[in-house]
């Protein structure tokens, strides 16, 4: 499955969503999700952010392409994602959780490790904080 994610920064904060459905229900993640048939990657990231957070965004550029394979307890692959993560700028809307996100919140960089979040997601976020000024 091809998916997109959005890194949306506000000074020393990043917008995070808490997942409301499996996989990784209750874990925190970047807003994003699956690309629908006929949709461009940028259309998909704008739609997913709008659905999950209520915000309108402008994708500024691709930060990373990330592959994730989630396995069941027996080691059999259950989910295989190729994720394209964009650095984005919020351009409008009102923050509110929606669709499959149970919460949408701005999180300060030092508080990220307090959340239930995958190491892979943390790595992408740190890369985003380090490189975000390259995206205008």
Where are these regions (language model features)?
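Conserved N-terminal beta-strand and adjoining loop/helix that marks the start
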Residues: 1-14, 87
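A conserved beta-turn-beta hairpin within the catalytic core of GNAT-like acetyltransferases
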Residues: 23-26
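The catalytic Nudix box helix
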Residues: 30-63, 86
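Active-site-adjacent beta-strand/loop module that shapes the phosphate/pyrophosphate-binding cleft
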Residues: 67-94
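NUDIX/MutT-family hydrolases
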Residues: 85-87, 96-128
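Acidic/histidine-enriched, glycine/proline-rich intrinsically disordered or flexible terminal extensions
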Residues: 131-136
């Amino acid at each position: 499955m091809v998916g997109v994610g959005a890194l949306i920064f506000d000074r020393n904060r990043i917008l995070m969503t808490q997942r409301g459905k499996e996989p990784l229900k209750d874990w925190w993640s970047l807003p994003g999700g699956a690309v629908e048939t006929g949709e461009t990657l940028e259309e998909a990231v704008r739609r997913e952010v709008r659905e999950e957070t209520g915000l309108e965004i402008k994708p500024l550029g691709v930060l990373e392409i990330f592959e994730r394979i989630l396995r069941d307890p027996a080691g059999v692959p259950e989910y295989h994602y190729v994720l394209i993560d964009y650095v984005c700028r919020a351009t409008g809307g009102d923050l509110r959780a929606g669709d499959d996100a149970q919460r949408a919140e701005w999180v300060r960089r030092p508080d990220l490790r307090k959340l239930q979040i995958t190491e892979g997601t943390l790595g992408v976020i740190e890369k985003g904080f380090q490189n975000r000024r390259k995206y205008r």
